[in-house]
Each structure stands twice: as structure tokens, then as C-alpha cells.
Amino acid sequence: FIALVYPLVEAGVLGNDALLSCYSLTGYSGGGKKMIAEYKSEDKSPLLFAPRQYGLTQQHKHLKEMKGITGIENAPIFCPVVDDFYSGMQVTVPLFAEQISCSSSEIADIYRAKYQGPVVTFCDKSDNGGFLCAGALSGTDGMKISVYGNDERILLTAVYDNLGKGASGAALENLNLVMGKDKAFGLDI
């Protein structure tokens, strides 16, 4: 969400008063040891074989940072979904064209300028035959940002590993910066 929204607020094409929504599809490993055990259990509940939406009270722990870091005034409606795959994540922020003061191709240009890799890259299309796969970057530390949709309805997407860099990868990235190395040195991108 932050990687998708912040550059647009920063560029002044998305107002900080925007009313946004976001949904994510994530592998179960992000739920921690208890959830991993539930999904790997031989007595796995039949309910775990289908996607499950959570955060239904709109009190998700990441809402504060989603709002604070992007500079938007209103927390988004956030609809996270966990599914029966180990790792990977897809985040989508849908926009009506009226919500933004530029075209989808101009949004792509903003992302293209900001996300030139190696960790976060803009991809004109990261779908697979019209399907966006949440597990496409499982086991890596990278993120792919894309823009889909049409002239009326725009989809901003990010695909990455929900485990991804994590705290240890972030620590390695910070150490690389302190040591004067490329920030991606030692990360699996």
C-alpha cells in the first residue's frame, strides 16, 4: 500500500484527503507460528482450503502506518485475505480516474522513475496471461509494482513475498548502507 500510494501523494497527483480502499492476498506464513501449524496440520479444517478475509473490524495493525507514512488523512478501507499457500503477497489499490489528477500511463511514469530496482522495480505488466499471482516472488526479497485497468478504473498493484526481507533483511540493507555497499548486497532479489 505504502509503495503504491506514497509516490502519488508525493507527486501531488493523489490528494492526501483521498478516500482509498486496498485489498491484499497473502500466504499463511505471515500469520505466524500458530497459523502455519493450522495450515500444515494433518487435521486441517476444511475452512482453511479457501481464502479467508480478516481485519473485519477495520482495526488492522498496519492501518496506522499505511495512513501515517503515506500522509493521507483517512485510513483506507483495508481488506486483507489469507489463503492456502505458504508465502507471497499481492496488494491492490483500486482507483476511479476521478480520484487522481493524471492518467494511468502518467502513474506508470511516476512509478517507473521511482522504482528502478534492484529491490523494488516497476513492471509494465507482471501478470501471467491476465492473472496476477500472489506467489510470483515467493522466496525473494524483491517487489514488482504495476498499473492495470483502463481510462475509468485503475488498479495499482504490488507483488512481493510477505516474508520477504523481514527484519533481518532490513537490518542487512541498513548495514550495507552504513558500510557503503549496494543496499541489495546479500539479499535474494
Regions found by a protein language model. Give the residues of each.
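A glycine-rich, Thr/Ser-enriched phosphate-binding loop motif common to dinucleotide/cofactor-binding enzymes
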Residues: 1-3, 54-61, 163-172
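Short, hydrophobic alpha-helical segments
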Residues: 12, 70, 97, 174-182
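C-terminal substrate-binding/catalytic lobe of Rossmann-fold NAD(P)-dependent oxidoreductases
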Residues: 16-19, 23-156
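NAD(P)-dependent Rossmann-like dehydrogenase/reductase catalytic/cofactor-binding core
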Residues: 142-189
